[in-house]
Regions:
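Canonical radical SAM enzyme core domain
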Residues: 1-13, 34-96, 104-114, 135-147
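Structural preference for beta-strand elements that scaffold enzyme active sites
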Residues: 24-28, 58-62, 85-87, 130-134, ...
């Protein structure tokens, strides 16, 4: 779904209302794939950056992208606008990745080479940025991930702008959940530590013990392409995640009961609720 001009203008109105009242504004782009509507990304980011500059507000912007459309010209334009932190995901090396990540143009065309070439080209940039290369882990792909990490080191090992994020895949309620080769909690912990020890010369993203999910934070929300407001970018089909919508004047029409469900961890400091409020909410309402 492409965001309409009406929603774009509503977001700008919201920014006009909000930015003068804060000290830090963080804009994150997530999908779907945000670069399918690159013009809208650039329009809103540019507007937000100018507003922040005008009011002396610190501007931070992050993008999660599959990397397929992140050509060098687009990358440079985004970084110069202030989008200087990216996350790009691989499902192992080329052979393994192309089993799962196929092109929208052809079900027989893998995406690894295009994504890798785009990632490689970012090295040419003289700008300051950070790219987290997310590597998905399953119960059967550790060899493939190791192969990918060797390739990453040979290409980016001397550049401290690139980091590795090891992340196990999870069952999130999709139709193919039962087909996934999932790691147990203990297997995940052991495998990640094993890989970090083996590739200690790489930079790894450290989530830390005090991690708080963005969806648990009262001052964080997502505006979807249709103007719906959500808390979680994973549970997009969950009705409890539809907490309101943005109005034409930039104000937010919020359902307080739904909204507060996501921030319960800040009331009782329950670490499980802070780690993943979605899991807590689904568990509660399905019991």
């Amino acid at each position: 779904v492409r965001m309409s001009l009406t929603i774009v203008e509503s977001i700008k109105s919201f920014l006009k209302l909000k930015i003068p009242t804060i000290k830090l504004f963080e804009l994150e782009w997530f999908g779907g794939e945000p670069l399918l509507t690159k013009d809208i990304v650039i329009e809103i980011t540019s507007f937000a950056k100018k507003m922040c500059d005008a009011y002396g507000v610190t501007f931070v912007s992050v993008m999660t992208t599959n990397g397929y459309l992140l050509d060098f010209e687009t990358f440079e334009a985004l970084v110069q606008l202030g989008v200087n932190s990216f996350q790009i995901t691989f499902d192992g090396d080329k052979e393994n990745h192309n089993q799962y990540r196929l092109s929208a143009q052809s079900s027989s065309l893998g995406t690894f080479d295009t994504i890798w070439n785009n990632l490689h080209n970012t090295k040419k940039s003289k700008e300051k940025f950070a790219i987290a290369i997310r590597c998905h882990l399953t119960a059967i792909n550790s060899g493939s991930v190791r192969s990918l990490l060797k390739k990453i080191y040979s290409t980016f090992g001397n550049d401290n702008r690139y980091f590795i994020h090891l992340k196990e895949i999870s069952a999130l309620g999709g139709k193919d959940d039962d087909k996934m080769c999932l790691l147990s909690k203990e297997e995940k912990k052991c495998l990640i530590q094993e890989i970090k020890n083996e590739f200690s010369y790489l930079q790894f993203v450290d989530i830390g013990k005090d991690y708080i999910c963005y969806a648990a934070k009262p001052n964080t929300f997502a505006i979807r392409a249709d103007g719906t407001i959500a808390k979680c970018t994973v549970a997009l089909d969950c009705e409890l995640n539809n907490v309101g919508r943005i109005l034409a004047d930039g104000s937010l029409d919020i359902n307080p009961q739904k909204f507060l469900l996501w921030s319960q961890g800040f009331d009782d400091l329950d670490k499980l609720k802070l780690d993943c409020p979605y899991y807590h909410i689904i568990k509660k309402y399905n019991s």
